[in-house]
Amino acid sequence: LRGVTFKVIAHGYCSPFYRNDILIAHGNMKCYFQTVMNKKPNRLSGSGLLSFYERWAGAFSKNIWAVSNKVKSEWNELYNINSHKIKVVRNFINLAQFDYTDVNEAEYVTFVGRLEKGKGIDDLYYICKNLPDTSFHLVSSIPAPQNFASLNNVLTSIAVPYAKMPEIFKKSRVLILPSYYEGYELVTIEALCCGCPVIGYNVGAIRELYAESFPGVFIANNKEDLAQVAYKLISLDNEKYYHLRQTIYSKRELFSEERYAEILTAAFNEKK
């Protein structure tokens, strides 16, 4: 097409030796591995090779769009990528799909994500076990480990269609995310846009939004603290609790497609 300029856009480590106009960084493989495994990845391991590809993808790209300020710093510090070519462009969702309609008796403490080590599965088990009078709903793409079967307060749902997720959040008293690493997880945004409070560790969207004093976002330091914060939230009387949900809901425009378009346009047009 004459007169048309095309942009080459890639994600993460998908195109390590190709000159992209924009590389979208949803996280950092090296930081993920070091955080979860508490050691550096072996260069010839799967994580080591993916980190290698990711680093070179960043080096060959003209611009990098990181989903959070933390991810931007990870690419700068761990891959030695010049911070001037990294812009922060956050995720967004369809606000019309995630709303406050039909929110009534919120009953569960809900977890959404893969039930694996990086998502804090051991901490999640500890919390479920130590709050036996609290109902938990685990929503995942894979079954829960066998030890969860002994807990009578845990309901597990596998492969829930995305269209059903708003209903999950509307029935959730609180979303709990004990992840050790996140980039800028959509599940936090989706929950907040239904007015559901979120608690987790100092990672991902929780980290960024807590720093910006976004209502309904709570940070815990460890699994004991996480259980305590969860208990305080589920123990709120209904008047205070639903006032909190309405306050959260009132700030949801931050995650709108229109807001994302503004950030996107600014990132495209910024002078180099």
Go through the PLM ranges and name each one.
Residues 180:
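Aromatic "clamp/platform" in nucleotide-sugar-dependent glycosyltransferases that forms part
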Residues 197-200:
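Short hydrophobic beta-strand element within catalytic cores of glycosyltransferases
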Residues 216-224, 232-238:
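Conserved acidic donor-binding segment of nucleotide-sugar-dependent glycosyltransferases
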Residues 43-64:
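Membrane-proximal helix-turn-helix segments that form the acceptor-binding/catalytic region
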Residues 65, 102-119, 125-131, 137-139:
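Conserved donor-binding/catalytic core segment of Leloir-type glycosyltransferases
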Residues 167-172:
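Short alpha-helical donor nucleotide-sugar binding micro-motif in glycosyltransferases
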